[in-house]
Curated annotation (Swiss-Prot):
Any GO CC annotation of this UniProt entry: mitochondrion
Localization per Swiss-Prot or TrEMBL: Mitochondrion
Source taxon at top rank: Eukaryota
NCBIfam families referenced in this protein's UniProt entry, alphabetically: rpsJ_bact
Principal location class: mitochondrion
Annotated protein name in UniProt: Small ribosomal subunit protein uS10m
Length: 235
């Protein structure tokens, strides 16, 4: 026979109901009467987390996550060539992306960036002029290039783009801009015929000196001087 001494009325009540044949579970009212429970309350911090939705980004800021937009080329008239050079690919590609985005908002039709051949330079020098004079050391430098072309644009707008990217340039990236301008030629005034005659006269100075026109023109100029004519007449 099991002998137990129950001193607490709550424990006695629980044990008595536990060993009953029906085994009815305790109700919530009985538990609340016997035990003082403090239910948890939901704070404001947990409810406000779902309302912290980030605001929608502007279109121009969201466009930074995509490739730069480009205006279509309509007439195919080349206006300018932008050639960029750098020793690092990352800064070069970043600045090309910046130029394309700036040109798009200015309304310039642009193509590129087109990768140009990389220039490789190597040097071999001695490590030291005294102790390590017999050992050599090699140095190598790579110059990366990109080409961006501007089409069908006003020269003033192109100059505005060049000024803007020059003002916001990146250290270590060189920029070379070549512009092309077109002017009207009046055939009635005779400018075309004068230009053709001038070109033909430079070629007909001496047929044997066509490969180097500047040297041939200089030789003819020296032969026509009075000092050379004096010696030629004596002979």
């Amino acid at each position: 026979m099991l002998r137990t001494s129950v001193r607490s009325p709550l424990l006695y009540r629980c044990l008595s109901k536990r060993f009953q044949s029906t085994a009815v579970p305790l109700s919530s009212k009985a538990v609340q009467n016997d035990l003082e429970l403090t239910p948890k309350q939901q704070t404001n911090s947990s409810t406000t987390t779902s309302t912290n939705i980030p605001p929608q980004l502007p279109v121009n800021v969201e466009a930074l996550y995509y490739a730069p937009l480009k205006n279509p080329v309509t007439h195919g008239h080349l206006v300018a060539d932008l050639q960029l050079r750098a020793y690092d690919n990352e800064n070069l590609d970043f600045f090309c992306d910046f130029i394309l985005r700036a040109g798009y908002y200015l309304g310039l039709p642009m193509t590129g960036p087109k990768p140009l051949p990389t220039r490789r330079e190597r040097w071999t020098v001695i490590r030291s002029p005294f102790v390590h004079a017999k050992s050599k050391e090699n140095f190598e430098r790579h110059t990366h290039k990109r080409l961006i072309r501007v089409w069908d644009s006003n020269p003033e707008v192109v100059q505005m783009l060049v000024d803007y990217i020059t003002k916001n340039s990146i250290a270590g990236v060189g920029l070379k801009c070549t512009t092309y301008q077109r002017t009207t030629v009046d055939a009635k005034s005779g400018k075309i015929s004068d230009a053709i005659e001038e070109i033909n006269s430079t070629h007909n100075i001496n047929p044997s000196l066509k490969e180097n026109e500047e040297i041939g023109a200089k030789v003819v100029e020296l032969l026509n001087t009075p000092t050379f004519k004096k010696y030629l007449e004596e002979k």
